[in-house]
Design a protein with these regions (language model features):
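Conformational coupling and interaction surfaces
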Residues: 2, 20-30, 174-177, 185-313
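Active-site histidine-anchored catalytic micro-motif
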Residues: 2-51, 97-195, 201, 208
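Phosphate-binding glycine-rich loops and adjacent basic patches that engage nucleotide phosphates
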Residues: 7-16, 69-76, 94-99, 143-150, ...
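Short, mixed-charge aromatic SLiMs
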Residues: 40-44, 72, 156-160, 271-287
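Metal-dependent C-N hydrolase catalytic cores
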Residues: 46-117, 275, 284-296, 306-310
Length: 313
């Protein structure tokens, strides 16, 4: 059964690779895409998104920009990856079919209007901060009735998150930390949430073996795109650092296409919006229920995304 998916991302390598993979999923109908300048700069992310849609599909999807700003910016060095992706030769070859372009609507407007046009409920896929969804909810709370569920790459319940910034205690995950107030707004809504947390994404690091696997099969256009894209980021070699790259967003997108890759548990949770722990997601007896993806079959995951990429030859 085909599911309708709206994708909001923040332009990192794994966000843009996720867009590429979603376009190859036969059980997914991608009905909308928007991007926010969180872990990226907005203009190259917009441009790369349009190019990916036109290069790897025939979909008529207008990519909506977000002009929202978070409380805690991502490091500039991480945000530069969108420029690299936008400049890839494979995305700049002339294409015969150009259906996608930049939308004249802002992301929150595009979310509202796209949801309301549908005859069936939509799965929201967010691989960046929840800022645009929070703004959409504030503008029109009735959109909740059009949402099947939210699948979000964000948050963690581990003792240590992946934020290492001044004046923060290190307990948060970056997408939650960028705009913790947005997380609170979404958590306080009635939307069903599947959270792909660090508990599972930490199980899919980019390793030298993964890179070599893709290098060995680069005769496939899609595999070559994967390999070249991830050449921009540091792999896990000897130990995890603040810059070690995991396939955070790709795992989240893969879960949309194949839920059997993961296991989840139900938790009652909330989020801290302010102070040195801002962005920390935590369990509490009076919290809202969410499904936390806490385990992934590493081999099955990499087999799945590699098979999807091989469809483009």
């Amino acid at each position: 059964m085909t599911k309708k998916v709206y994708f909001n991302h923040d332009g990192g390598v794994d966000d843009l690779v996720s867009l590429f993979l979603l376009l190859q999923m036969e059980n997914v109908q991608l009905i909308g895409v928007s991007t926010i300048g969180a872990d990226c700069y907005l203009e190259p992310s917009l441009s790369a998104s349009v190019k990916i849609i036109n290069r790897f599909s025939n979909e008529d999807i207008q990519v909506a920009p977000s002009y929202e700003r978070g409380k805690n910016p991502f490091p500039k060095e991480w945000r530069m990856h969108a420029f690299f992706m936008d400049a890839l030769p494979i995305l700049n070859e002339p294409v015969k079919h150009v259906a996608s372009n930049v939308s004249d609507k802002e992301a929150f407007e595009d979310i509202i209007q796209t949801l309301k046009r549908q005859s069936e409920k939509v799965t929201l896929l967010f691989t960046g901060p929840l800022t645009d969804l929070a703004k959409a909810l504030q503008k029109d709370s009735s959109i909740v009735q059009y949402i099947e569920k939210l699948v979000w790459m964000g948050g963690t319940f581990l003792p240590k998150g992946n934020v290492e910034e001044p004046e923060h205690d290190g307990s948060a995950e970056w997408n939650a930390y960028w705009d913790p107030e947005a997380v609170k707004i979404v958590f306080d809504s009635d939307i069903e949430i599947d959270m792909v947390a660090l508990e599972s994404t930490n199980q899919v690091p980019l390793t030298l073996d993964v890179r070599q696997r893709w290098a060995n099969e680069r005769q496939y256009t899609g595999i070559d795109f994967l390999g070249v894209s991830y050449a921009a980021v540091p792999p896990l070699t000897h130990f995890i650092t603040n810059s070690t790259y995991f396939l955070w967003d790709v795992l989240t997108a893969a879960y949309i296409g194949n839920k059997d890759l993961v296991h989840s548990i139900e938790k009652k949770v909330d989020v801290i919006s302010y102070g040195p722990s801002q962005g920390k997601t935590f369990e509490c007896k009076d919290g809202r229920k969410i499904n936390v993806i806490n385990h992934v079959d590493n081999n099955a995951f990499f087999d799945y995304i590699t098979a999807l990429a091989k469809k483009v030859n």
